[in-house]
Amino acid sequence: MHLFYTPDLELNKGEYYSLNKEESTHCIKVLRLREKDTICLTNGKGRFVFAEISDANLKSCSFLVNEVKDEYEKRNYCIHIAVAPTQNMNRMEWFVEKAVEMGVDKISFFVGEHSERTIIKRERIEKIMVSALKQSLKSYMPQLDEKANFYDLVKNAKKLHVKINYICL
């Protein structure tokens, strides 16, 4: 099954839709999908769409929606991970990828007293998140928070009045 990420996905059964040029090219040229092949789409907010390709065009691949599932694989709890960025950005990218694949709901980066890295390329992290979401066939994209101070992060977490587990490595 091939999953495509479309953040503005608000389709219903029986409707037609077209992928953007980048996703269409990937669908037809790279994955070599053809008409009548089944694909899945998600908006990253729980909507999961099963569709059949109706027009395999490199510039605008069209499909017909067969089934729509809202709140697909929704859980009744939330996993929020806060981490200080490491000096090696590859490790942070790997962490984000694995967190998305595992189904983390929220990722926060914080700066501590001895943090080695204070700059995070948000656009790069978001691309990695989209890639991991598609690879793991998840329907929920984690919320990526802005960088915060460690003490502010803990203070805000205590205001939520929920069970919190802290793990320091």
Predicted features and spans:
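RNA substrate-binding interface of SAM-dependent RNA methyltransferases
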Residues: 72-167
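N-terminal positively charged helical leader segments and presequences
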Residues: 1-71, 123
